[in-house]
C-alpha cells in the first residue's frame, strides 16, 4: 500500500468532466518518508477532516472562552458525515474492528499533535481546536463503551 503522508480532504482532487470513475479523482501534495509510515496514519488524517471537521475549523474566524465554555460555530456537512461512515465501514471491513479502532485512535493522535502548533501560532483559536480534540476523544470513548470495536458487534451489523 502506498502511503501519502498527509491524506486530507483538501488533498483529494475530484473531477466532474470524466466518465471513468477511476479517473474522477487524484491525490496531491504527498508527504512521504516520515519515520512512521502506516496507512492507519493516512486514514486517521482523513478522519480528522471527515469526522473532526478540521477544514471547517480552519475557516472559522473566531472562538470565545467564558469560564468552562468554548463557543464557536461548529460546521457539519452531511456529505462529510456520509463519507465518514463509508470510510469507517470500508476500513472496518478490510482491517477488522481492531484496525478501525486503531485508525480512530490515530485521528485522535493527529489532533493531539496539532495542539502545540495551534498554541504557538494561533493562540486565539487554539481553544476551538482543543474542543475538536475533546469531541473526537468523547466519540472514541463512547464507541468503545458501546462495543463498536468488538469483532462480534461489527459482524452482527453486516
Task: Kindly give the residue locations of the regions a language model identified.
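ATP/Mg2+ or Mg2+-diphosphate-binding catalytic cores
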Residues: 77-158
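Active-site activation/catalytic loop segments of kinase-like enzymes and analogous catalytic loops
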Residues: 25, 31-91, 108-123
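Active-site acidic catalytic loop and adjacent metal/ATP-binding pocket
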Residues: 1-39
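Residue-identity detector for glycine
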Residues: 5, 17, 33, 44, ...
